């Protein structure tokens, strides 16, 4: 557990608290092992999310799906997978308001898509930004979760998955992550400044 608490987190990453680190499931002793376990877990979640059965039967614009997808992505690593955070962060909303904000975001996204308020890609970018930056519902894994659920919704509406910086690793420090964070922060500053994030997501 100490390797997690002592880890130097990349810019924009949510540091894992001791209470959350204690919820680690496997016997992992390095960040490298943790990343490998999470990557495998996420791959399995992806297979579930994009399977024809799930794409046909599940509705990603339901609050239950938001939690279920996060659980599927991290349930073999963290006991808090699929559970909303209970602590305040320097990003996202008050933890007591997460369910309310998630429900409102899902309703907004459904309205945007049904009424063609914006082009589908822009709907998805706005949804992604609100989920990861304005709500940030989970203790960790918010970016990876928000990107996958955004892809699922896009595919459900006839669009291709986003490339998110040509498939670059957005978890670790690097030019792609810096560009991704800069695009999110541009939207933080101006809710109509979607160009940078949209271009990054489709690059």
Describe each PLM feature range.
Residues 1-203:
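FIC/Doc superfamily catalytic core
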């Amino acid at each position: 557990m100490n390797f997690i608490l002592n880890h130097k987190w990349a810019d924009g990453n949510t540091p894992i608290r001791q209470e959350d680190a204690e919820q680690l499931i496997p016997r992992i002793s390095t960040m490298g092992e943790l990343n490998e376990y999470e990557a495998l877990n996420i791959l399995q979640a992806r297979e579930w999310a994009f399977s024809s059965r799930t794409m046909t039967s599940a509705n990603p614009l339901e609050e239950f799906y938001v939690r279920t997808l996060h659980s599927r992505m991290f349930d073999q690593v963290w006991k808090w997978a699929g559970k909303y955070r209970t602590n305040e962060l320097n990003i996202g909303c008050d933890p007591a308001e997460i369910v309310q904000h998630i429900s409102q975001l899902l309703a907004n996204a459904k309205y945007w898509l049904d009424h063609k308020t914006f082009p589908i890609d822009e709907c998805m970018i706005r949804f992604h930004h609100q989920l990861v930056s304005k709500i940030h519902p989970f203790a960790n894994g918010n970016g990876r979760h928000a990107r996958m659920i955004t892809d699922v919704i896009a595919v459900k509406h006839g669009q291709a998955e986003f490339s998110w910086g040509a498939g670059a690793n957005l978890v670790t420090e690097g030019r792609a992550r810096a560009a991704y964070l800069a695009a999110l922060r541009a939207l933080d500053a101006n809710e109509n400044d979607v160009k940078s994030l949209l271009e990054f997501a489709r690059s």
